[in-house]
Amino acid sequence: MRTTCPLSSVAVACVAVLLVPACTPAPPPTAAPAAADHPDLSGVWMAFAVENPDGTGNAPRYSPEGEATLDEFAAQFSEVPETGAWCYGTGMPSVMMSTVSYPIEIVQHASRLVMVAELEMQVRRVYLDGRAHPDDFLPQGVGHSVGTWDGDALVIDTALLSEWQLRPWPRTEQTRITERVYLTKLANISARPTGFVATVEKPINDDVLVDEITVTDPTLYAGPQRRTAYFQRMADTATLEYACSAEHWLEALEKNRASQ
């Protein structure tokens, strides 16, 4: 490990490494703590409901051009395989709207917030250090996210998303996603508007994380598409390895064994 000796004293001080504090190894770096003046969103969370605040159902509204694009893509194939069966992560915004009992772990620090979704092990990094979206970023399913605090709510802007031509949430490189994430209590969301789709009758505790999601794309959607996802805290739960692709590999291995 590198020592911290001044050059002028290397010959003497570094010989006495156990006696001179200046020569002791530098302490290992530690992660920056979450800023004390903002709510800590850290923890394991499970989505239990998604709603459309417009009350018009959860299916997105596409533009005529968007409908044509999706139909044209699907018409090329006799059948479009189910993405989950092939361990193919659907990316944003679907990863924040999944209510299929796979948790999301949030780790918050002062400079960034990391979300790890157990489903297909999709990872989001939300940068909180004031940086802008880069010019040389390779588009990907979860995009590139930057966040700013608005009081107790974290506002996330996601861009640089890769193209996705499957319903219900297609994307182009022009797709933009804005989120407003904050903590509340279950009692504060008891008045549920039309379009609320719950997967459990009642969350297991009163701690609720709310993610207000707005998806825009000038070619795909008929205006901004808004959804609100509700997550319950899973205090005694840990995210696990999502070893989906291992099954396909083992199946291929067995086929090779049988062909010998």
Ranges and model annotations:
Residues 9-22:
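Bacterial N-terminal signal peptides
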Residues 3, 14-15, 37:
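Terminal low-complexity, poorly structured segments
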Residues 1-7:
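N-terminal secretory signal peptides that target proteins for export/translocation
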Residues 23-260:
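Hydrophobic small-molecule pocket/channel-lining residues, especially in calycin-type beta-barrels
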